[in-house]
Amino acid sequence: MSLLYEVRGLVRRYGRVTALDLPALGVDELRIHSGQGLTLVGYNGSGKSTLLRLLAFLEEPDEGRIIYHGGEDPRREVSLLLQEPYLLKTTVFENVVLGLKLRGRRDGLEDAYQAAMRQVGFD
């Protein structure tokens, strides 16, 4: 199995939430290989979702590095699907085309939106 991610000295903070200024997530070192199974276990608020958002490059770490070895642009190859469905508090259009925008697509969004609407019977 080839190395997919290297994580070193990763810290993510969401503002000062306690007098101790504890980070939401702290990872000294983590290596993830292609095809490897990985289970994240922890209490609510322990940083599991934060780590996934960082690995999907949806957020930036406050400290440390995430090195992705899978290809040139991880935002085109990595996605995150959460267990609970979530809609942004915006328009249906923006929710439907969000994935395309995150991957850098700017052209043809209206056509993609219309095709998606037809696919689910909203034509």
Label the model's feature ranges:
Residues 1-7, 11-30, 104:
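A short, flexible loop at the N-terminus of ABC-type nucleotide-binding domains that lies
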Residues 85-98, 104:
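Conserved catalytic motifs of ABC-family nucleotide-binding domains
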Residues 49-50, 91:
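Conserved Walker
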Residues 41-43:
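The feature captures the beta-strand-to-loop junction immediately N-terminal to the Walker
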Residues 38-39, 80:
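Short beta-strand immediately N-terminal to the Walker A/P-loop
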